[in-house]
Amino acid sequence: FSYLMLFDDYNKIDLTLLPLEELDNYLKGDKLIKVLIDKDCRIKRDIVPTDIDYHVRKPSAREYDDCCNEFWNVTPYVIKGLCRKEILFAIDHFNQIVRHELLRMISWKVGIETGFKLSVGKNYKFIERYISEDLWEKLLSTYRMDSYENIWEALFLCHQLFRAVSGEVAERLHYAYPEYDRNITKYTRDMYKKYTGKTGCLDSTYAADIEERREQ
């Protein structure tokens, strides 16, 4: 049984009660457990908390490709929402999938640079500590999604960031950079131009990025 408790002094406790016969399984289930009190001396071994189960893990070539596939091939769903003026549909696919895959790729970059020996926290909450200020500021700027134009700009920038980071990860791990980028890039630019009548303030940078990636 679980109880979420907020006290008058604003201390918060998530209290879970379980049968004694489940104690061993509970202790084995999460290496972050720290024993504060064991009044009846029921725990017969030392419990040393560690976050090792949550360390960023080196992706296989298949996992890397799957991340790229998901990022690029969900982009058309975001674009569909933007073109149809269905902003919540666009935001949902952006945040739930496209952004998630970008953060996952950035976490692999962090893992490579730190020897895959640390965690970036739940929901990537510590990732700022391990990336450049420039990357962090650009990442934060993609969270402004209060208008169709801002979402388009966020999408262009997410593509730029993903292309740069995934290219670096591929190079460091000796994986092949997939072809999804080129076709989805063209589709994104064409749809933006068709439905907004603009070429986009990021268009030249966007084109330069994809051309540089092709040459590598």
Q: Regions from the language model: what does each represent?
A:
Residues 20-29, 155, 159, 163:
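Short alpha-helical interface patches
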Residues 21-23, 44-45, 55, 135:
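Residues in flexible loops and secondary-structure boundaries
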Residues 1-26:
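Conserved catalytic core of two-metal-ion nucleotidyltransferases
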Residues 55-215:
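Conserved nucleotidyltransferase catalytic core and NTase-mimicking acidic/glycine-rich helix/loop elements
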Residues 19, 37-38, 147:
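Short, solvent-exposed coil/turn linker segments
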Residues 26-40, 95, 99-101:
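NAD(P)-dinucleotide binding in Rossmann-like oxidoreductases
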Residues 18-20, 27-32, 50-51, 104-105:
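Surface-exposed beta-strand edges and their flanking turn/coil or helix-capping segments
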Residues 32-66:
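A short, charged helix-loop
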